[in-house]
Amino acid sequence: PVSVQELGCDFYCFSAHKLLGPFGVGVLWGRTAILDTMPPWQTGGAMVLSVRETESDYQPIPQRFEAGTQAVAEVIALGAAIDYLQGIGLPEIAKQEDALLQQAKQCLRKVPGLRLLGSEGPSVPVISFVLDGVHPHDVATALSAEGIAVRAGLHCAEPLFSALGVRGSVRISLSFVNTIEEIERLCTSLVQIGVLFR
């Protein structure tokens, strides 16, 4: 669990799709003292108290920031995703994902020419890597042909990749629904891709 009070943050947000929920919706928590001073960024129905020709009076928070029709189905789906994850248990999910992460790192380290990016400390089950001599997009395309989904590119972090001296990376995101067999298939495919492109 996260305590925004313990963190001392002004805002805290996350995307639903990071929790197996739908795209296009997320959660934003904001400190009341800050939200109260903010004007609405968008206008529409249900967020105003009254509208006149030259000015408007807005609802109090949070309604002030809820213009128009909300993404009702997506919000319900996010709730279902959270219920699903809580039903399994977040500690159990974290345990499974950490075991998969360690297995994946061990397997990937054996792939010739593959370099893991990032630190060796505790981390979420996301791994970025480069395969020497093979552009990340080529790796992703070849893996996709094998039915393996990854992301490739700069991952909204171009300054980081410039500092690392690489032109992007391949990123895998593991989840408790993945298997050891899938990790082994990924590593086998990467060995074959390395041979094919060199």
What are these regions (language model features)?
Residues P1-R198:
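Pyridoxal 5′-phosphate
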